[in-house]
């Protein structure tokens, strides 16, 4: 029998019952105050309109600032991604869920229909046709004219060089195209639509997985106020909105308070607390908001609200911070992080300069973000990935694991198909992404350890009650 009253998660998995004012100056204790019991009887499964895709959001302190962003506004330069890692569960998953239409996932060379190795000279092409076109252009080769319009395919492509070169030109290969590097978005969408249609016709199950992916994306967009697409546009200066105010030292922090309204914290001049503590508390408030957003998103994952209520709470307790740091990466580049819904940008060096232990909190998140961003996921990928994180059947204290694993198994299939369609050239992306789940758990563990240090050293500082409950007995 499922308990209908529990002392942990706010009503209806939101945070309506938790007052953000609990962080007032008069609350200076880390002791966990008992919560009143919460009635979960009002929880109901959301209505799914045709299984639709979703909105991402920053998980940072709510400060807002301004200044020259030029030196921070360059395109993201990221480090190499982590090497592929296969857990025992991953290997088992791959064995039991081999994609029956793998051959369909391989994009064909537009010239000879061999397997394309990538996007070369403006089109998808195999290594053979890429090299042939490059040699022809560089050496300025002229072939004997042929009027037979020879058919060019894998076995015959070397028989008539004239017709092969004409086919290269006909499908759109161009020496100038190499400078653009990536496929134009319109061309990419057209190609993916063609591939998806072929796959759906031959494998009806994939149509269901793509419908699930779309539903998760739509829910994601509705649940989170700042998507990765919006954040990257701000970070790279590709938006018509005003550039974010840059916080890089104490003076710019003071100036920022004159330009941006603080959502949770009164102006610096009216505060007796030092900046490090105030920034830390701002992060707490933003985290509480993020918990609410993630909870709303979780309720839209098909099957989640049908799980045991205690298990729903456990999954959220262990999953929310892993998701917070996943989505925080979207707001970061190697130099800093967007804050206040993109209105401000706080530099990495400034955060690192805060006194210990506060200066140690963000650096591991930056290190993770640089590598995670190298995977070049978009919001539709992230929507499925965070659902996979939530539905992790190995969380401590779960009462009924099987239905959780069944849901996650379906999500893993949807994620693998999504990555193959959205990143056809990144064959190891699925494995790399699963490795990031392990990295995220380590980051959360280190974060909890730092909180234990603060609990002992900062006697005049409080931790939000909801976060206290989440961190209690966490790793």
From Swiss-Prot:
One Pfam family, short name: zf-C4
GO BP terms in the entry: cell differentiation; cellular response to insulin stimulus; fatty acid metabolic process; negative regulation of cholesterol storage; negative regulation of inflammatory response; peroxisome proliferator activated receptor signaling pathway; positive regulation of DNA-templated transcription; positive regulation of fat cell differentiation
Domain NR LBD, first and last residues per copy: 208-473
GO MF terms held by the record: chromatin binding; DNA-binding transcription factor activity; DNA-binding transcription repressor activity, RNA polymerase II-specific; E-box binding; nuclear receptor activity; transcription cis-regulatory region binding; zinc ion binding
Record note on modification: Phosphorylated at basal conditions and dephosphorylated when treated with the ligand. May be dephosphorylated by PPP5C. The phosphorylated form may be inactive and dephosphorylation induces adipogenic activity. Ubiquitinated by E3 ubiquitin-protein ligase complex containing FBXO9; leading to proteasomal degradation. Ubiquitinated at Lys-222 by TRIM55 leading to proteasomal degradation. Ubiquitinated by E3 ubiquitin-protein ligase STUB1/CHIP; leading to proteasomal degradation.
Sites of Phosphoserine modification: 82
Cellular-component GO terms for this entry: cytoplasm; nucleus
Covalent cross-link Glycyl lysine isopeptide (Lys-Gly) (interchain with G-Cter in ubiquitin) as placed by the record, residue numbers: 222
Zinc finger intervals, NR C4-type: 109-129, 146-168
UniProt main location, coarse: nucleus
Alphabetical keyword list: Activator, Biological rhythms, Cytoplasm, DNA-binding, Isopeptide bond, Metal-binding, Nucleus, Phosphoprotein, Receptor, Transcription, Transcription regulation, Ubl conjugation, Zinc, Zinc-finger
Record's subcellular location: Nucleus; Cytoplasm
Record's comment describing the protein's domains: The 9aaTAD motif is a transactivation domain present in a large number of yeast and animal transcription factors.
Described purpose of this protein according to its UniProt entry: Nuclear receptor that binds peroxisome proliferators such as hypolipidemic drugs and fatty acids. Once activated by a ligand, the nuclear receptor binds to DNA specific PPAR response elements (PPRE) and modulates the transcription of its target genes, such as acyl-CoA oxidase. It therefore controls the peroxisomal beta-oxidation pathway of fatty acids. Key regulator of adipocyte differentiation and glucose homeostasis. ARF6 acts as a key regulator of the tissue-specific adipocyte P2 (aP2) enhancer.
PANTHER family: NUCLEAR HORMONE RECEPTOR, PEROXISOME PROLIFERATOR-ACTIVATED RECEPTOR GAMMA
The name this protein goes by in its record: Peroxisome proliferator-activated receptor gamma
Organism: Oryctolagus cuniculus
């Amino acid at each position: 029998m499922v308990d209908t009253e529990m002392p942990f998660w706010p009503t209806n998995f939101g945070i309506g019952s938790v007052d953000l004012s609990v962080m007032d100056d008069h609350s200076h204790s880390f002791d966990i105050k008992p919560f009143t019991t919460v009635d979960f009887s009002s929880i109901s499964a959301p209505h799914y309109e045709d299984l639709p895709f979703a909105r991402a959001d920053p998980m940072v302190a709510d400060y807002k600032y301004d200044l020259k962003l030029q030196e921070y506004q360059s395109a993201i330069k990221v480090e190499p991604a982590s090497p592929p890692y296969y857990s025992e569960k991953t290997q088992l998953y791959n064995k039991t869920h081999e994609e029956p239409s793998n051959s369909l996932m391989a994009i064909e060379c537009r010239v000879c229909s061999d397997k394309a190795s990538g996007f070369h000279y403006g089109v998808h092409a195999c290594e053979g046709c890429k090299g042939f076109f490059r040699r022809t252009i560089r050496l300025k080769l002229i072939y004997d004219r042929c009027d037979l319009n020879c058919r060019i395919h894998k076995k015959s492509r070397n028989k008539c060089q004239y017709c092969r070169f004409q086919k290269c030109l006909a499908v759109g290969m161009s020496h100038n195209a190499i400078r653009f590097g990536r496929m134009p978005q319109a061309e990419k969408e057209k190609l993916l639509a063609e591939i998806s249609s072929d796959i759906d016709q031959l494998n009806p199950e994939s149509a269901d997985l793509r419908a699930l992916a779309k539903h998760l994306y739509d829910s994601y967009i509705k649940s989170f106020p700042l998507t990765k697409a919006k954040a990257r546009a701000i970070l790279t200066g590709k938006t018509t909105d005003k550039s974010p105010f840059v916080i890089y030292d104490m003076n710019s922090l003071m100036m920022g308070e004159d330009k941006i309204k603080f959502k949770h914290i009164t102006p610096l001049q009216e505060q007796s607390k030092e900046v490090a503590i105030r920034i830390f508390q701002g992060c707490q408030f933003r985290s509480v908001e993020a918990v609410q957003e993630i909870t709303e998103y979780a309720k839209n994952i098909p099957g989640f609200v049908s799980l045991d209520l205690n298990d729903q709470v456990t999954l959220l307790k262990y999953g929310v911070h892993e998701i917070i740091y996943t989505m925080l990466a979207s707001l970061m580049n190697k130099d800093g992080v967007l804050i206040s819904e993109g209105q401000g940008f706080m530099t990495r060096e400034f955060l690192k300069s805060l006194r210990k232990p506060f200066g140690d909190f963000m650096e591991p998140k930056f290190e993770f973000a640089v590598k995670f961003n190298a995977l070049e996921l978009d919001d539709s990928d992230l929507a499925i990935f965070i659902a996979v994180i939530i539905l992790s059947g190995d969380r401590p204290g779960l009462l009924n694991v099987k239905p959780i694993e069944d849901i996650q198994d379906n999500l893993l299939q949807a994620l693998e198909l999504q990555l193959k369609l959205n990143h056809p050239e990144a064959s190891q992306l699925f494995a790399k992404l699963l490795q990031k789940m392990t990295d995220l758990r380590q980051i959360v563990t280190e974060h909890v350890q730092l909180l234990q240090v603060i609990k002992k050293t900062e006697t005049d500082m409080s931790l939000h009650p909801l976060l206290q409950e989440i961190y209690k007995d966490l790793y």
